[in-house]
Amino acid sequence: MGRLYWLPLLAPLLLLRPPGVQSAGPIRAFVVPHSHMDVGWVYTVQESMQAYAANVYTSVVEELARGQQRRFIAVEQEFFRLWWGGVASDQQKHQVHQLLEEGRLEFVIGGQVMHDEAVTHLDDQILQLTEGHGFLYETFGIRPQFSWHVDPFGASATTPTLFALAGFNAHLSSRIDYDLKAAMQEARGLQFVWRGSPSLSEQEEIFTHIMDQYSYCTPSHIPFSNRSGFYWNGVAIFPKPPPDGVYPNMSEPVTPANINLYAEALVANVKQRAAWFRTPHVLWPWGCDKQFFNASVQFANMNPLLDHINSHAAKLGVSVQYATLGDYFRALHTLNITWRVRDHHDFLPYSTEPFQAWTGFYTSRSALKGLARRASALLYAGESMFTHYMWPAPCGHLDPTWALQQLQQLRWAVSEVQHHDAITGTESPKVRDMYVMHLASGMLGVRKLMASIILDKLQPQAPMAASSGAGPAGHFASVYNPLAWTVTTIVTLTVGFPGVHVTDEAGHPVPSQIQNSTETPSVYDLLILTTIPGLSYRHYSIRPTAGAQEGTQEPAATVATTLQFGRRLRRRTSHVGRHLVPVANDCYTVLLDQDTNLMHSIWERQSNQTVRVTQEFLEYHVNGDVKQGPISDNYLFTPGKAAVPAWEAVEMEIVAGQLVTEIRQYFYRNMTARNYTYAIRSRLTHVPQGHDGELLCHRIEQEYQAGPLELNREAVLRTSTNLNSQQVIYSDNNGYQMQRRPYVSYVNNSIARNYYPMVQSAFMEDGKSRLVLLSERAHGISSQGNGQVEVMLHRRLWNNFDWDLGYNLTLNDTSIVHPVLWLLLGSWSLTTALRQRSAMALQHRPVVLFGDLAGTAPKLPGPQQQEAVTLPPNLHLQILSIPGWRYSSNHTEHAQNLRKGNRGEVQADLHRVLLRLHHLYEVGEDPVLSQPVTVNLEAVLQALGSVVAVEERSLTGTWDVSMLHRWSWRTGSGRRRGDTTSPSRPPGGPIITVHPKEIRTFFIHFQQQ
């Protein structure tokens, strides 16, 4: 059944299959030396630098300089940047410049890391790519043009669009489903032109090469030796290199006695691969994980081997050459043959065998996934706040150099954690701790920066005390909205007193509510309704009622009341729905069943539709003993049977207030358990008149608690409805575009192979209604029954597989996690209009900076006095920042500066502002919001000053788009992209039009004060 599922995808491959190799003469093998250097995974970055990574660059640079024919490709930038900044000598730096100029050293991808494709958000992919590209362009004046995405666990359809927007000419991937790869090899369909975005189509297509079954590693088995082949430097040793230079498993040296045997092995492998591709050009990767730490011994053995093969090329039918990835793709492009087109479908999920579905990592280390996204959101807010502080003119005494350092530290950390063994949760515990430490340190620095900016603005008023804790005068909260839309939402603060007055900048009372904390009995949750224009602040004074000034008539925050329901056993009968309790706002009525303490149904006012909705927690019990069968681990999800309920009893309480009503459900493993393992806290907001609360009203906010789990359990939240969904769900690729996910029955492992990543949103629907889930971290998601959607929240695993144990890659995660989902229910038209903006509102919630009042509340500028930055509802401010790059936007001028060798004398440019705009909607998705949108950047950015110049750039900022000419590849579709990445546009003007799904990048220059 698995093979049959792929027949529709294989049909165009079979039709295009040529009768044979399309060229006479020998096969031409491009030997591409490389080292796969994971930024983390088993060892920390510093451990890897000490053991092998620094030696890779030191020895490769030395060896490339010794032979004109030698080549090497470098991929992730983190190790190279550490080597460049802390290890490389002046001579080695000069050699690198020379090798790059000669094309013998080539940077591919060029990002800080090789990011994961399944569980990363597009914004963070762009960030880490921009980080690496900015360094490479600033340092060398080069711009990577090819990708080498060989190790992410599955391929997203967002990736071809991302790399096309970055200016790449070709894309290389590897890990796709095993049975699909086998079929594509058979059909010689591993190369195609990928149009990943249905809206952008050929405008942002890219030629794509899928590696064959050998992937990125050199075939290590050679028939004449019991050692691995072609790895003459052996295997890296930790914690540091051996003093005698002898490593484990070093391949037998090439000698006159065995050179024919080596040549036969290499040629046989090249010919095997040639049969899987349409041209006689064969890419032969030479390398693997942690290779080339001794490039001398590598090239010393490969050089005579390649010379031997070439001297017998006519007889062997193969010629070989050292090559970069660019050399290979240029040779392919020169052939100018016709390639098939692949549409916007992705290559997820990824399986390597029938019982090895790599769908567990969609959820592994949920806490790290959540932290990574929170760090990204904080960085996003800090970038725009600092930019707005600097423009139109700095208003205080903040040191811009220090400020930029705080942002750069978090940029590095957020980029680092996008690695395909980081945010995936597939790293060892000590490496997880490294990522957490880097993120936490970076977040602390940016919070200090944001607090400093606030204090700079408040300095004349001096309302905050330096001490911590609740002072007698109360608290002061500054709330910053990083989105370029006006946002109405609830912010939640923790206070130590049960009665409070909340006032705004002008001293006016603010709608607020006080209630018992969900976490700590001794404190209280204070909920404040706030409306904040784009890139603006609100300031609130919070004082205990006992400390209010005498004689004032300020209304206090309303106090919520709690209605408790006794513990109910899990019912095994269908007699439910007889005693329902309604909880309502102006958009929804949630009906709760008193007999079960579970949700029963939701009525949506606008469509006047009621949908049965029940939620519960289940667990998959999985095997950890390899002797007993397939196992689950950090990567794999391998359930032996269906999930079972993880609770026997549930308590419920309703906390009802004038502003917010919360439904709290606590799930216990048995009737007498003292502590609950799972919880759902659902919130409906009652938006007062006079506030635009469309988004706030039309969502049910849910926070869950899961854990600690028992060993070898995988916890899911299952939402069951009466929607006739046909077991079809939709989940997103990287928060950018949606993929239809029909349930597929396989011979084996159907549960796991029908799990998909949800990075930001998912939904299911029937002809009348749609239920949308929005998330603030990645999860695995599936529909295991009609009208059902289940979200995997947490995993705790241990197994005795030697490989996992040897690398400490078991997942004995005893943490308690608190993921958040927002639910939207309504018609297709309603949810289409709200889904994208609501997802952004969840990802980029207002940032609250909290301090103690030292005296009377200050009078500060309210939103009416601030100049907001506002975009239309279908256009998202993807970034507004001051990158601080030290290069000229003029490529010729920058190249001249590099040749003069004065890069170190150039100061960080604090005047250039990076702006990126993202159209959120697909073509035809909404009759209004899917239209192209025209904006005047002078008007949009007037709060920052007078715009004097607008430069449109490539996605990562390194190309002037007027100078960017990507390769065009011949296709059989009848449509052909021109040689530019976008339609012709008027150059440099402030009035721009952004089309559906476009992401456009600009450098903005303001009039200096």
Swiss-Prot record:
TM ranges: none
Pfam families from the UniProt entry: Alpha-mann_mid, Glyco_hydro_38C, Glyco_hydro_38N
Keyword line: Glycoprotein, Glycosidase, Hydrolase, Metal-binding, Secreted, Signal, Zinc
UniProt catalytic activity: Hydrolysis of terminal, non-reducing alpha-D-mannose residues in alpha-D-mannosides
Annotated protein name in UniProt: Epididymis-specific alpha-mannosidase
Amino acids binding Zn(2+): H36, D38, D151, H420
UniProt subcellular location: Secreted
Keyword Glycoprotein included in the entry's annotation: yes
Gene Ontology biological process terms from the UniProt entry: mannose metabolic process
Top-level taxon of origin: Eukaryota
Example of a GO MF term: alpha-mannosidase activity
Gene3D superfamilies tied to this protein: 2.60.40.1360, Glycoside hydrolase 38, N terminal domain, Glycoside hydrolase family 38, central domain, Golgi alpha-mannosidase II, Golgi alpha-mannosidase II, domain 4
Co-factor binding details: Binds 1 zinc ion per subunit.
Cofactor entry: Zn(2+)
Covalent S-S links between cysteines: none
E.C. designation(s): 3.2.1.24
UniProt record similarity statement: Belongs to the glycosyl hydrolase 38 family.
Active site, UniProt feature: D151 (nucleophile)
Glycosylation sites: N226, N249, N294, N336, N516, N608, N670, N675, N748, N808, N812, N890
